[in-house]
Amino acid sequence: MRALLGICVLALVTPAVLGRTMDRCSLAREMANMGVSRDQLSKWACIAEHESSYRTGVVGPPNTDGSNDYGIFQINDMYWCQPSSGKFSHNGCDVSCNALLTDDIKSSVRCALKVLGQQGWSAWSTWHYCSGYLPPIDDCFV
């Protein structure tokens, strides 16, 4: 029983161990290198700050509909990624939710751009924090 408890605890903390914590500049530079428009980078930095504190390995607590949000941009598993549990997902980004928890943010960025294209910035519940002040990113490229 004790071994089972240890395995369960390990399974719960594994995504946090696999992820990394970025900052506004490391995120802005990586996204710019991936071709994301520079005029959007402050907005993405704001979303990442408020959704995950720039942490890539975060799985959010269950939402009221039972879904969870994954990764640096907290992408929802009911609509955008396939959870490892096998529960139904529309999987609009055609990606596993676990792929959104790794150090490599390419899958997260691709999926977030798709969400933005279909739902706009208001797809993120924290967007209201970003509609006024945006974190500066110009100093990230000096």
UniProtKB/Swiss-Prot annotation:
Effect seen on changing D94G: In strain: G130 and G140
EC number: 3.2.1.17
MF GO annotations: lysozyme activity
GO BP: defense response to Gram-negative bacterium; killing of cells of another organism
Domain C-type lysozyme: 20-142
Record has Signal as a keyword: yes
Keywords, alphabetical: Antimicrobial, Bacteriolytic enzyme, Disulfide bond, Glycosidase, Hydrolase, Signal
Record's protein name: Lysozyme X
Organism of derivation: Drosophila melanogaster (Fruit fly)
Gene assigned in the entry: LysX
